[in-house]
């Protein structure tokens, strides 16, 4: 069988490519039974709908906003972010650096003093200065206090590496940088000013994030699921799968770079070596259904302290009441890991205990649903090897007419909106 464009992976990036190819001949090959990648939901026997962690639509592009509204129509709600940090036994608003109000007085003054000192000493400092690692950037941008109580411990917990080895290439607009006035205002008043790229978000009213995928795939007839790729012959332009061979003109890959390098026959040694230098963080996504309504009024909470094994927890009912049966609540808890040794059962037990110690769960709460989703590839690590390794691999793939896109195909920190736009843009290169 010969196809103009073969798309590897049915996540949102791959689906976007197919959607924007319109009437051209293509096929999506997806290894799972359902498309969506990490942008999908599961429904358990009790009627709880769980996403693969919090999948919220932070949309800036007019095009993507128009597309999402076209697909979901009335099944779309705009939410104002209500996110918090739990540390020092108190809740403070997100972002930490602009909302110190509620913390012990000593910590507030330590954070303000450090911030002022950083501003005085580093007035010419630029995020674009590549000589700085993320650790240095935190100290130069926020000072010792804010770095000590949130930026350093939280990011060490998320990335699972020494953040002195983390570059600043991923930052973009993801880390809010408040002014001195905003820091002081947020230190002495309960300031609800929305700061950051995710101050608002869209989310489906019904069906979880899966509803976006369901509407998108209605416009994409060329989808094959349960397809396992065994090898790719770039000289003959053939993809070999468990259901036969497929000859292509263009190959678009959204699968993780280390995985596609393994699949290609005769990969040069320098490309193999570059692939082995790529690093990433995995996430264990624990979902719980609780027989109590309104366990929290928050969207999600960050946990920077080491005593908690998770870095973030969110509450589905506050995205949409349709995600929980009547009289119940549900939540997702995210635990990042690299080379996990602890069993899922032990991690679940510890997580429940820590949620109780933070008084999010009560000792009397009855957990009526548990769903653990393992995400092997979750966050790309930006270290000193990423840029050169990525360039080596992508140059090789491009030379062989393979377009590698998306979070893991492009090996980058990106959003659902980014994936949709990149999928659209990629179609311009497919002839």
What is each model feature region?
Residues 3-28:
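N-terminal Rossmann-like FAD-binding beta1-loop-alpha1 element of flavoenzymes
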Residues 6-8, 29, 246-260:
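Short hydrophobic core segments
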Residues 22-45:
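Glycine-rich FAD pyrophosphate-binding loop
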Residues 46-121:
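Dinucleotide-binding Rossmann-like beta1-alpha1 core, especially the glycine-rich loop
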Residues 90, 101, 107-108, 112-116, ...:
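Active-site/ligand-binding neighborhood in enzyme catalytic cores
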Residues 248-250, 258-403:
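C-terminal segments that line or cap access tunnels to active or ligand-binding sites in enzymes
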Residues 393-414, 419-422:
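Short FAD-binding loop at a beta-strand-to-alpha-helix junction that anchors the flavin cofactor
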Residues 420-431:
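Internal hydrophobic alpha-helix adjacent to the cofactor/substrate pocket in enzyme cavities
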């Amino acid at each position: 069988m010969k196809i103009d464009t073969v798309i590897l992976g049915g996540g949102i990036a791959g689906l976007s490519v197919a959607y924007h190819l319109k009437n051209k001949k293509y096929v999506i090959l997806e290894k799972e039974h359902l498309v969506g990648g990490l942008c999908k939901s599961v429904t358990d026997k009790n009627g709880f709908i769980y996403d693969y962690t919090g999948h919220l639509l932070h949309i800036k592009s007019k095009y993507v906003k128009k597309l999402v509204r076209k697909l979901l129509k009335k099944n779309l709600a705009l939410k104002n972010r209500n996110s918090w940090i739990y540390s020092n036994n108190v809740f403070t608003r997100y972002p930490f650096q602009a909302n110190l109000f509620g913390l012990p007085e000593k910590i507030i003054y330590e954070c303000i003093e450090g911030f002022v000192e950083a501003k005085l000493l580093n007035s010419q400092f630029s995020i674009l200065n590549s000589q700085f690692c993320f650790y240095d950037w935190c100290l130069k941008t926020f000072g010792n206090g804010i770095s000590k109580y949130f930026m350093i411990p939280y990011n060490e917990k998320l990335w699972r590496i020494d953040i002195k080895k983390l570059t600043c290439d991923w930052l973009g607009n993801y880390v809010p940088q408040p002014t001195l006035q905003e820091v002081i205002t947020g230190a002495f008043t309960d300031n609800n000013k929305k700061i950051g790229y995710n101050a608002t978000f869209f989310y489906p009213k019904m069906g979880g994030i899966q509803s976006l995928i369901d509407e998108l795939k209605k416009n994409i007839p060329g989808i094959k699921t349960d397809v396992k790729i065994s090898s790719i012959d770039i000289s003959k332009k053939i993809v070999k799968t468990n259901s036969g061979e497929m000859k292509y003109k263009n190959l678009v890959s959204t699968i993780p770079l280390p995985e596609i390098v393994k699949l290609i026959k005769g990969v040069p040694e320098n490309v193999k070596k570059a692939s082995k230098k790529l690093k990433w963080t995995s996430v264990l996504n624990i979902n719980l259904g609780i027989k109590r309504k309104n366990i929290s009024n928050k969207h999600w909470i960050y946990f920077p302290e080491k005593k908690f094994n998770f870095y973030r927890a969110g509450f589905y009912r506050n995205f949409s009441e349709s995600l929980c049966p009547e009289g119940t609540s549900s939540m997702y808890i995210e635990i990042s890991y690299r080379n996990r040794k602890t069993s899922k059962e032990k991690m679940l037990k510890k997580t429940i205990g820590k949620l109780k110690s933070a008084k999010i769960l009560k000792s009397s709460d009855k957990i009526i649903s548990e769903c653990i989703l393992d995400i092997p590839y979750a966050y790309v690590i930006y270290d000193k090897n990423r840029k050169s390794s990525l360039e080596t691999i992508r140059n090789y793939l491009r030379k062989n007419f393979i377009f590698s896109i998306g979070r893991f195909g492009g090996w980058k920190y990106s959003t659902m909106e980014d994936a949709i736009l990149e999928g659209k843009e990629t179609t311009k290169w497919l002839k």
